[in-house]
């Protein structure tokens, strides 16, 4: 191992010490510091061997973060792509995410606050949910359930039985 490869590995290890990142993000940072491609490849290979660099685990962490903050699958998928996670890894993780119905209903409760018939508020809430990465199908279903007291009661009863 030459000096530049060792320096690249040391720098990469320092980058990964405080926070996780994807292989692409690490490669971009090392390239920005003008490390040679050979040194970058060596650092990535070695850190992957040691388990310090794991795109699958990083993707799961990012997905959990965004789901916990009320974002939908489309937003999670977009964020994984932005961070350099491969299509294959993203496709493994996305189906395992928790169902989003409670997040959609919570957002509707916060936005509509009991004004079930106000079309302007419903459109505003639907647009906000779409921007958060929920599909129109999920949004329309949630609005139907939220605005119909009988459906809402059935949904709450079913949710209580699941817990």
Residue ranges of predicted features:
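An alpha-helical, amphipathic repeat domain used for nucleic-acid recognition
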Residues: 1-163
